[in-house]
A protein has these predicted regions:
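N-terminal anchoring/stem segment of glycosyltransferases
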Residues: 1-130, 203
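A short acidic (Asp/Glu
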Residues: 18-19, 45-48, 143-148, 209-210, ...
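A short acidic, often aromatic-flanked loop/helix-cap motif at beta-alpha or helix-coil junctions
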Residues: 63-70, 164-166, 254-259
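Short, surface-exposed amphipathic charged segments that create phosphate/polyanion-binding patches used
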Residues: 70-82, 171-176, 263-272, 298-299
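Short, flexible, basic/aromatic active-site loop/helix in glycosyltransferases
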Residues: 173-189
Length: 299
């Protein structure tokens, strides 16, 4: 029987700031696999703590991380648009073009963007092992229930945030710089969709990752050094129908709540967040924005 997988990136964190991600999964008796991207220079305390939780560690070379940070902080991006445009055309050919584009993204994109490449690599190497996959942020996420319960078929779920893109300065910035002012104008009145949490069946997730890798490679010349461009790519692609048949779930009606506004949820006497349908929300994202919030998952 195939398992479900939760996979995320935590290359810059020690165990302490992200411990509730793992302890909350233990509380709900999650029986799938947990795979986390970590630096190959991870400290022993963090490494041992993650292994104690049964986490599968996917090592990312620290040299790659350091290079992309230096590149992002340099002035070279001001003149690199044409060289990268030409490089993308050269790489985007042949049967192994996705492999070439993935390596390219790993070199020039911060981990927020290159994580999709590592997710793809891991899933490709374990293609017969998993039924459903949740790609997720780690440090600011906790679990109240199994996020995969009730899923069936070939699902691909994206999760809205509360505000329209025009009111999210970062998302607007990323879309404008990656795809242009006209592209932003066409979708700026639509809700932002969080790239931090996505759930899909194996086949649908692989298609999503392949397209994310390809389009991120394509816009490499438009990077400006500000991390998070994957959010702009994610939203642009969803609203331009790159993923037909996918579901965009209203916040917080589905498996995930992006906790931007406490007015959209209710805290029960059992210290669990429920949505307006009185259903416990399996995944709570951005819980750390409310330090006084007393959740069962944090106890």
């Amino acid at each position: 029987m195939k398992k479900n997988l939760i996979i995320g990136a935590a290359t810059g964190y020690k165990y302490g700031p992200m411990k509730y991600f793992f302890t909350s999964l233990k509380k709900i008796d999650f029986d799938g696999d947990i795979a986390i991207l970590v630096s190959d220079k991870i400290d022993e305390e963090t490494k041992n703590a993650l292994l104690a939780h049964g986490v599968i560690l996917i090592y990312v070379k620290s040299g790659s991380i350091e290079f992309t940070k230096k590149y992002a902080q340099s002035r070279f991006w001001k003149i690199h648009r044409l060289p990268h445009k030409l490089l993308f055309k050269l790489l985007n050919t042949g049967k192994n073009k996705l492999c070439k584009l993935s390596k390219y993204v790993k070199i020039f994109h911060l981990i927020s963007g290159s994580r999709y490449c590592y997710y793809y690599d891991y899933l490709l190497a374990n293609r017969d092992k998993y039924k459903f996959i949740l790609t997720t942020d780690v440090r600011d996420v906790v679990f109240q229930a199994d996020p995969f319960a009730g899923l069936d078929g070939e699902a691909l779920h994206f999760y809205e945030q509360d505000d329209a893109i025009r009111y999210n300065s970062y998302t607007s910035y990323w879309i404008k710089h990656a795809f242009g002012k006209k592209a932003l104008a066409a979708i700026e009145d639509k809700k932002s969709i969080c790239s931090g949490t996505t759930i899909g069946s194996f086949g649908r997730m692989m298609d999503y990752l392949e397209k994310m890798i390809t389009v991120q490679a394509q816009i490499t010349g438009r990077l400006t050094g500000l991390g998070g461009f994957d959010q702009g790519v994610h939203d642009y692609m969803i609203y331009n129908n790159y993923f037909p048949g996918s579901d965009v779930i209203e916040n917080p009606a589905g498996e995930v709540v992006t906790l931007e506004n406490l007015d959209t949820v209710t805290l029960t006497d059992n210290q669990e967040l429920v949505n307006r349908y009185n259903r416990v929300i399996p995944v709570v994202h951005l819980y750390d924005r409310y330090p006084d919030l007393k959740l069962k998952a944090l106890l």
